[in-house]
Amino acid sequence: MKKRLLASLIALAATPLCAKDLTILYTNDIHAKVDPYIARYIDEERAVGGFANLATYIKQEKAVQPESTIVLDAGDYFSGSTVDTLTEGEAIIDIMNTMGYDVASIGNHEFDYGWDNTLVQLAKANFEILLGNVFYEGTDKPFWDKPYTIVERDGLKLGIIGLHGKFAFYDTVAANMRQNLEARDEIEYLQKYLDELRPQVDVTILLVHQGTPARQSSLGNNDVRRA
């Protein structure tokens, strides 16, 4: 399912900051496309993408500003190639571990092989994984134990939050793959984590895997802006 996703700069702290350069590179819905492929909506003849090309670009950008570049992903790195299917996502994490990613959130396709597999494979990542609003059903026990992280780049403290849209979770994750899990309102949890982070950081960044009914603009939907 095609989805709009948001990796957005949510807020600057009220304290005045000295001008600094910060480069944020982010991907979403890379769907295990390890090799370049024909994406007809981009080019009907020329193959595009591929993890090697992406890794090269990340390496080049980090070489320019190594102290002020951060690389993020907003989910759906699983599901879309044979190697992913055969390894249930393990090979994708292995490759992403070599590409220079710093932080990623979890999308619906990371649940395609069952949530128990999600836990097993994502635990192998050498970059941070975030998800803050999916819980074991009927409890306050989070499915993933890290809703946000604080990363420093060139003297700036960045608070990064990972969420999954509630509608998108129920609409796109097969019922048998999310059994005994529940997603809760992302706006409520966004506000909670913003309140916790703002006293500690200079900038907050949201990685959210969210469906098209949210109708977000390039700045995010109205609820996100209000938060």
Task: Give the positions of each predicted feature.
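Gram-negative bacterial Sec-dependent N-terminal signal peptides
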Residues: M1-A19
